[in-house]
Regions:
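Acidic, polar-rich low-complexity tracts and alpha-helical solenoid repeat scaffolds
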Residues: 1-190
Length: 190
């Protein structure tokens, strides 16, 4: 029932069903599935406190696959950020950003740099972004966001020439159909 509600995008109902499943499940696989479903529903319905609790609960499971562990750390990090507890997100972001081949890893790398930038730690933000650029990712959106953040760092440091170089290169090479073009235009217009 919970799976069907989840697939129908009725996340509030699915959340209740997953809570019920978690309470009555007897085998470890069903308990884990319930915890995973609960965590995903909490994240998708914008409930960071619930997502945090569910992620922590899921991470206590002894036999999680690396993918599920990474997803749980990602959800936990995003929940901490939403709850304005960024410092608690750092360890998870550092761990999952080691593998930028995954969508969570790519976003985590960007978020890690963004947190450093927000805390006026340009040196660490730049180091994270240079590592991201060097290692690459198939997730071009997050790499583009990384280039824009790198340009923001250079702008803040007064190196407008370097910032413009990155932004112009990104403008010429990024093919995505999203807000990246507007972000570039906004910065080049200043």
């Amino acid at each position: 029932k919970a799976e069907i509600e989840y697939l129908d995008k009725d996340y509030a109902a699915a959340m209740e069903s997953f809570k019920h499943l978690q309470a009555v499940a007897e085998n470890p696989e069903n308990k884990e599935a319930a915890k995973l479903g609960l965590m995903r529903c909490a994240e998708l319905t914008g409930q960071p406190q619930e997502a945090l609790l569910a992620a922590n609960d899921l991470l206590k499971e002894p036999k999680l696959s690396p993918e599920i562990m990474s997803e749980a750390r990602y959800v936990r990090a995003k929940a901490y950020i939403s709850l304005k507890q960024e410092n608690k997100a750092l360890a998870d972001l550092k761990e999952i950003s080691k593998d930028t081949r995954t969508i969570h890893g790519a976003e985590a790398k960007y978020l890690l740099a963004q947190l450093y930038y927000d805390n006026k730690d340009d040196k660490n933000a730049e180091t994270v972004l240079m590592n991201f650029i060097e290692n690459g990712t198939p997730h071009q959106y997050w790499l583009a966001r990384g280039f824009i953040l790198l340009a923001d760092i250079y702008i803040r440091q007064g190196d407008d020439f370097q910032a413009r170089q990155y932004l112009t290169s990104l403008q010429n090479n990024y093919k995505g159909d999203d807000e990246i073009a507007a972000m570039i235009e906004d910065r080049l217009g200043k």
